[in-house]
Amino acid sequence: MNNFSIISEYKPAGDQPKAIDEIIAGLNSKKRSQMLLGITGSGKTFTMANIIERTNRPTLIMAHNKTLAAQIYSEMKSIFPKNAVEYFVSYYDYYQPEAYIARTDTFIEKDSSINEQIDLMRHSATRSLLERRDVIVVSSVSCIYGLGSPDLYYQMTVNLEPGKSYPRDKLLNDLINLQYERNDIGFERGCFRVKGDNIDIFPSHYSDKAWRLSFFGNELEYIHEFDPLTGEKLAKLDKAMVFGNSHFVMPQETVNSAISGIEEELQKRLEFLKSQDKPLETQRLNQRTQYDLEMLTETGSCKGVENYSRFFTGRNAGEPPPTLFEYLPEDALLFVDESHVSVPQIRAMYNGDRARKEVLVEHGFRLPSALDNRPLKFEEWEKFRPQTVFVSATPGPFELEETGDTVVELIIRPTGLLDPECIIKPATNQVEDLIGEIQATIAKGFRVLVTTLTKKMAEDLTAYLQELKYKTSYLHSNIHTLERIEILRDLRQGTIDILVGINLLREGLDIPECGLVAILDADKEGFLRSEVSLIQTIGRAARNSEGRVILYADKMTKSIDKAMSETSRRRQIQQEYNEKHGIIPKTINRAIHALAELEKVDSKLDKKQAHTLFDNPAKLKAHIEKLKKDMLKAASNLEFEQAAKLRDQLKTLEEAALELS
């Protein structure tokens, strides 16, 4: 059995050893829920990693959005390079669910765009959970949505071992049943091809490796792992397991049984609609469902097949759907990161999904069984979750109630950094005062974060600061992940001095160069100026030894008072620790991800180099192909900065190739 093994130059320090021991003691005493209160910069991720290593249990880490999940995944992958660290989030780049607006008699068809790279990583995650124990899966809250049955998924695998006999036609048919596509011309993920005595399979969980099965008659002689781009053999395998190209693969008998169940429900529903004198809904439901049944009979699938998932999984009406939680072993461990946001998200998901689908069922677009294609209810999630550690700097009421207000604190930072000094200034003329503070902060070589209440105010402030010749950018929800990372990189490098946003705390900004956080209209009570939001925003300045926070307010609200009191308490604890151990706080000098490599490519220089180094067009083409492969690999590892750098290089080299041709 593989054990977890941390590879790091750091050892637990500050509050970390005590917190690790307390959490592990709680796990050993069978506590179902624990609360880890970890402030910004206290090393929450490293603490979680040490708990995982000490307990040696498969682990699921839930985060409230893809970006935070990606950050945790990247950190865990660097801490556990020898173990399986996986990423499981929604694979939709774009998703428009089907819906019906009765008021205007408008039906909106489902429309979506699937990210192939994330789909690959989802397959890799479920495969790892079924094959090994040293697994950490970092997931967004979308892991509570329905997934294919783990029993069927595992049952449908094709096990391959050299020396054994596999009738050729049966093996090819098995691959097709796993929803692999035969393609002897284009070879890509989820495909197989046949060449003489060889069968090449491109597994659903790989982007840069494929398997070559070499036969003598029906006997499998060798399994080679090879590079699908170059054909280079990478390794000889003793065995291989081919998992489905979809989490919803199923044997034909299951499909036949499901079709019978759908037909039976359809007849009952049609009779009900007729009794309600709804001829339009009756005709609509019959037409749509009969078409789906024909597709299922002929191809084994149909558009919107997930709406019939209850019949494929053998669940009864109202029972919870299979989710990622059913892929976890019984002794798994769960961390819920930023639980004050994640837990309310889990609560809200079921009701929103249910309301939309009830309208579809009522108006004859879907059978009632479509209601069972859903996320878990909160109480179902409560039932399924294993031993859980909630992690947050600002715990919510549910976590505190679950843990009996017993909180394991992670307040002392090993770096000695204090919580920032907080100052209240009048909101009247706040922008004019802010300009002066910005000048003083930039003069010290630091950066500034400004948070406003509305998008309009953020846009206007950004435009005003740019007019005054300040290097300013605006961060908002419409910016894609890669562009967001580029903006943060520019901020850290000094290309940008000021970043304006509405809800910066949600962006997970950790900028050691940040010397000032300015909170405009801090006295306007509400979600953006609640105690939790203020504490989280104040934490953005906690990675700089000279970090300050200015709250612009004309009155002292309860939220401001509580946030400042909590910040002061944490600051006092850290000061006492520093004095006792003779620690002088120092700003964290975190690398800007290999600055030299991430600088934007100078196109003229690259073109010149391309002509000099790649005067042979064939070599240049081969180098471009390699860069494409490296870019995709970087993207699959969520190394977006590296992927962006390679993308820029590709663009200039392709221009050079065009000139050379």
From Swiss-Prot:
Limits of the Helicase C-terminal domain: 430-592
Domain of life: Bacteria
Keyword terms of this UniProt record: ATP-binding, Cytoplasm, DNA damage, DNA excision, DNA repair, Excision nuclease, Nucleotide-binding, SOS response
Chief localisation class: cytoplasm
GO biological process terms held by the UniProt record: nucleotide-excision repair; SOS response
Sequence motif: Beta-hairpin, positions: 91-114
Domain UVR residue range list: 621-656
Pfam families given in the database record: Helicase_C (PF00271), ResIII (PF04851), UVR (PF02151), UvrB (PF12344), UvrB_inter (PF17757)
Family, per entry: Belongs to the UvrB family.
Its biological purpose: The UvrABC repair system catalyzes the recognition and processing of DNA lesions. A damage recognition complex composed of 2 UvrA and 2 UvrB subunits scans DNA for abnormalities. Upon binding of the UvrA(2)B(2) complex to a putative damaged site, the DNA wraps around one UvrB monomer. DNA wrap is dependent on ATP binding by UvrB and probably causes local melting of the DNA helix, facilitating insertion of UvrB beta-hairpin between the DNA strands. Then UvrB probes one DNA strand for the presence of a lesion.
Subunit structure, interactors included: Forms a heterotetramer with UvrA during the search for lesions. Interacts with UvrC in an incision complex.
Protein name per Swiss-Prot or TrEMBL: UvrABC system protein B
Organism: Rickettsia felis (strain ATCC VR-1525 / URRWXCal2) (Rickettsia azadi)
